[in-house]
């Protein structure tokens, strides 16, 4: 397994359209293992393929119950939210949007159709924090960053901060 480079805002790969996974092979297994290792190393609780420069409809999410527990994760290929209920506001951060935490409004309960690592169709209904994580990661597959859910004022403040990081000293 390998730790991959995480792409950060404003890298254009984060906005690219992703393509569906159609081949479920050892290469995909290796990619998801590397993604999981990268996610836990960061540390994070979810990672989408665009965040490591791959324009694929693929996410890995931690299923560990506590931070100190075994590194368990699930793979979701071609995930799609098919049902959503209620809303909630929760604090989010993103490995691709460093140094920013913000309150974001998301659905409280969602149903997601996806394929597992073997290409088998699956469906899952989740709520609360896990629903937030899945919505966040699925947004990445559509070129949407959690930054896009913020007010224009907060977005612009963050953009100014990022520009300063790249100015010559």
From Swiss-Prot:
GO biological process terms on file: co-translational protein modification; translation
CDD domains for the chain: Pep_deformylase
Enzyme class: hydrolase
Domain of life where this protein originates: Bacteria
InterPro entries per UniProt: Peptide_deformylase, Peptide_deformylase_sf
Enzyme Commission code(s) on record: 3.5.1.88
Pfam families: Pep_deformylase
Presence of keyword Transcription regulation: no
Transmembrane segments: none
Protein task: Removes the formyl group from the N-terminal Met of newly synthesized proteins. Requires at least a dipeptide for an efficient rate of reaction. N-terminal L-methionine is a prerequisite for activity but the enzyme has broad specificity at other positions.
Record protein name field: Peptide deformylase
UniProt organism field: Desulfotalea psychrophila (strain LSv54 / DSM 12343)
């Amino acid at each position: 397994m390998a730790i991959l480079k995480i792409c950060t805002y404003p890298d254009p790969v984060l906005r690219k359209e992703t393509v569906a996974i159609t081949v479920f092979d050892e290469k995909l297994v290796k990619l998801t293992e590397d993604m999981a290792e990268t996610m836990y190393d960061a540390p994070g609780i979810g990672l989408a393929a665009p965040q490591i420069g791959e324009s694929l409809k693929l996410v890995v999410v931690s299923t560990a119950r506590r931070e100190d527990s075994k590194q368990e994760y699930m793979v979701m290929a071609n995930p799609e939210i098919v049902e959503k209920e209620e809303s909630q506001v929760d604090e989010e951060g993103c490995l691709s949007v460093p140094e920013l935490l913000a309150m974001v409004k998301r659905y409280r309960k969602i149903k997601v159709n996806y394929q597992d690592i073997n290409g088998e169709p699956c469906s899952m209904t989740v709520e609360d924090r896990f629903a937030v994580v899945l919505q966040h990661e699925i947004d990445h597959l559509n070129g949407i960053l959690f930054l896009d859910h913020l007010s224009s004022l907060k977005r612009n403040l963050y953009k100014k901060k990022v520009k300063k990081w790249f100015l010559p000293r």
